[in-house]
Amino acid sequence: MKSLSGYVESITFRNEENGYTVLTLSYGKKEMKCTGNFGYISEGEYLEIEGEEVFHDIYGEQIKVTSYKVIPATDELSLKKYLGSGAIKGLGAVLANRIVDKFGEDTLRIVEEEPERLAEIRGITIRKAMDICEQVEEKKDMRDVMIFLQGYGISPTLSNKIYTMYGQKVYDIIKTNPYKLADDLSGIGFKTADEIARRAGVEVNASIRIKSGMCYALSDASLSGHTYLPKEKLVEKTINLLGLRDQYLNADGTYNMDLLDNCFTELVLEKKLILKNIEEKDAVFLSTYYYTELNIARMLLELNISTPEDDYIMGVKLDTIEKLSGVELDDLQRKAVIETQNNGITIITGGPGTGKTTTINAIIQMFEADGLEVSLAAPTGRAAKRMNEATGHEAKTIHRLLEISGGASEETGRDEIDAKFGRNEQNPLETDVIIVDEMSMVDTFLVHALLKAITIGTRVVFVGDINQLASVGPGNVLRDIIESEQFSVVRLTKVFRQAGESGIVTNAHKINKGEQVALDNSMGDFLYIERENAQMALNATIGLMMSKLPQYVEAKPMDIQVLTPMRGGILGVNSLNEQLQKYINPQDENKREREIAGVIFREGDKVMQIKNNYQLEWEQRSEGGRIYDSGTGIFNGDMGIITTINNTTNTMEVVFDDDRYVIYDSKQAEELELAYAITIHKSQGSEYPAVIMPLVSGVSMLMTRNLLYTGVTRAKKCVCIVGRKETFSAMIANEDQHRRYSGLKWQLVNYYNEEQ
């Protein structure tokens, strides 16, 4: 181990997330590169460090710092370096030298105790003197907090958030209730707060720990799509989370509920939790989710105004539309169009080939014939693009329709709840009719934001396939609306002749019904290649991608999509992307590349955004480079191509499917992943010329019927199953669907009954 004392001459690099810093320490007439987690320090500060001497191939001798201490500046040289480092706004080297030359080693005492005396220096007013004093005190307080929090394993970025929100109160919060950090701030989850609490000496069965654990258990359940949990499941999840099973489990297998019930009752009285009876069981909601679903129910029922039209007039209008469009609607399609005229809310659901698009076009024509304005929307950019191509009308993502204007608040960082929309109750959408496609993908918070921007009297049409996978976010919106039986629902069931000749459509309906599919390659758009193990399936997938399918479906390899149920393993997303990249976009001296979080990204790579980012700025450009639109927000599932990588500025540019260009910095780029292969969940709302699905084996909870159905229906011209027939058949037979505990259906029925 080596010890050194010196000034921070310069900071070369700092990772704001984890505090890893590369700096140059000046001691005597020498300098030394130092690396380590330094937290909040500035150039010019005096450090005592201890660490291990290492030798870097490029940068030479360094010290890998294991511990350090900030020593307050006392001698004139260190005072000049600290005050003149630029860390204090408005104070440069010249003024710093004047201050220290006048006050010498008494400078910091003067700044802290008699700041008005700084005005004795030429160039410093009383106001500026007080500002310098405040900054020095603020930096001292902040540094003390950073060092204090670092002792609890908290990163500099989170420490900065904590200090910004609480200031000097943070000391009391850590000592009395560190779980408040998890309640108030994103990025400090329950597990982080629990570790802080452990270090602070909080007992494992303390009521503050149990209460926070219950809230976290419900929040964590929302990541699996739940908006509530039955009380017994919440108790079990909380006890397992807190590691209290042995302490609370009785001999008969029940739990000792005394302390748990006390904590639960307190949370209900504090209105953090809401307790209701659903399906004759105690259902527990986080208050946010309960009131969000309650408001959704209220708004839907208020919008559902019945305005019956004359049947004869409606029939004449439909006949005219059929003549003008040259399309004959079947009885269910006609009914769907009529229902949208008669009701404020209409739901149209159906599988592939049942004429949903034809029906949407007829609905648009009917309303426009009456001089009404129709707006089209979908949850993803790809789905909106498909809607636009199918109707010839502009379709926007729901986020863009609502004019997303930024995301999470800086204090909390909670994206979905704090997302800011330009369209809302005060500034509603100016339209007569709204048609939303791919409604099965829309989660609780997004439909809540949409409904808030719709005025009573506007017609709303929800279109979707109820058998697709549920939304990634919490809730079961489309299914709950349908099953509430409070609205007009039209189920399109007829598969039209042209669609019926498609192997994709025919087999998708068979899969949905649980009927086995003959993998005999008798239909040219539904192919099967038998491979017994993962490596063989991988090789076949690469061969299909590079040589067979592009010519067969007249598409580039880049446009063909590999879909898989899983992320891990040879046939998981991570491995598939690594292998496919080598063939589709191989290393080239003319292509710049960059490693981010262990993944190589290269110019020309196909990538996907994997989380909503409401702050990312984008611009749309014409072929000549003229910017014709701009905005903020790139969303989970958006796909694009890396156009340029700039290793000087550590940025890369991605152009997304709808011609939005985005520049990512290093941190933002961690929200991207290669997208030659994606999970079936991520493919929702998209359509590809061809889909390859490698299916050799997998855990039963992933290998389900509706997952297979969703994957198959993503293909437009051809789907190719690669793997084992037994696995394919088992997926069809596995109708186990992950049960989502959502309260919207109950809210709709309950609210309706109360209003009657």
How should each PLM-predicted stretch be described?
Residues 1-313, 756:
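Accessory, non-ATPase domains that flank or precede helicase/AAA+ motor cores in DNA-metabolism machines
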Residues 44-46, 604, 637:
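Loop/turn positions that initiate beta-strands
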Residues 438, 464:
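Walker B catalytic acidic pair
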Residues 466-632, 751:
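Conserved helicase motor core of P-loop NTPases
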Residues 630-631, 636-756:
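C-terminal accessory regions
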